[in-house]
Amino acid sequence: MPEHQFTLKNATVVTPDRVIEKGVIDIENGRIKQVREQSDSTPEDRNALDLSGKYIFPGFIDLHVHGGGGGSFNSVDPLDHEKARSYHLQHGTTSMLTTTSTTEFLFLEKVLASLSASAKAPSKGSRVLGIHTEGPFISPKRNGAHHIPLILEGSIELLDRLIFASNGSVSMVTVAPEIRGGLELIRRLISKKIVASLGHSEATFEEATKGIELGATSTTHTFNAMSPLRHREPGMVGAVLDADDIFCEAILDGVHIHPVAFRVLLARKGIDRVNLVTDSTSYAGEGDGKFSRPDGRTLVKEGNRIVIEGSDTLAGSSLNMNLALKNCLKFSGIELHDLSKLASLNAAKIIGLEGDLGSIENGKIADLVVLDANFDTQAVMMEGVWARNDLS
């Protein structure tokens, strides 16, 4: 059999609509040629790799990731970018939106230019599908860990500068719709086919709903840093729960949201409108301790929890997508085929790449994650090539 053709067999293959217990995946030229079920009548292929006892999921897609493995995407150093991409690939993330956070505007332009360039360079890390800019067009009342002096009002001119600096790589922008110029930003993003994601917002129900009506299709880390659901003022949480079509990010590290809140989100939005993200920082994969930020503040990492020193303000996570998937199973007990949607397919739909990515289906790119019985990553494949292979 030529090297560009091979077969994986006897694994539990997780597709969007079913789980194939004795699944076979034929791969050719970096794509999935056929997904089928092993049967006694199937001729034995001695070249096939037997993955008995393993699960095969589609490669995970993370649309909100700031760094990992000691590397940050809020950096102009391509070595930082490579550290983070390599770390997350090892944990099953085959595609991502590299995500920036609020920083000094001129520096942010340089960061975006650097991210765009490094995304095109050879890498041993996750594929970069674009850039998600989280800030600076957010509410100072719901800033989270974003430095208030650097938060800006909505400006078409400044937005266009960021898009230009990124060489058109900006694919998603977090916006608070209620800030001055916020709705104009959403209109501009939609006109440029960039995803507008609502977040870091003190919006009323009406203000958030207006943003959705204008075309916002995503919600940044649902429940976190947004106006909560109250019985007389439903806020942004109420607006995104009430709207049928908008997607909702969820950070499942056991810190950002309670498992019950996640189950409520799933019950209201449905499996097809929730996507798992990490919101991980450069400290993902690092030990506990104190870390200095460029803005002069200190972060404290203890286990899964990262906060600004002297406060309870969360500052991203130390999560990876493999752990998010395991937590999702623990918190919700959903079916495996639904889990694959939350970890992969829904994210691909948000950015319009579901034709090639996000699921194990005939004709799609062969991005795969092999998990053991404990759902720990054993191997990762990108475009039919092993990027990690710990299979015995």
Residue ranges and their predicted role:
Residues A11, K349, S359-S392:
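C-terminal cap of metal-dependent C-N hydrolases
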Residues R85-S169:
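Divalent-metal coordination cores built from histidine and acidic residues
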Residues D77-D80, V111-L115, I156-E157, H231-V237:
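Charged helix-capping and loop-helix junction motifs
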Residues G235-A250, G254, L266-T278, A284-V370:
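His/Asp/Glu-enriched, well-ordered alpha-helical/loop segment
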Residues L51-K110:
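Metal-associated gating/positioning segment near the N- to mid-region
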Residues M1-P43, M381:
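N-terminal metal-binding scaffold of metallo-dependent hydrolase/deaminase domains
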Residues D160, F164-G287:
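Active-site core of metal-dependent hydrolases
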Residues T133, L189, T219, C328, ...:
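Conserved, mostly hydrophobic/aromatic
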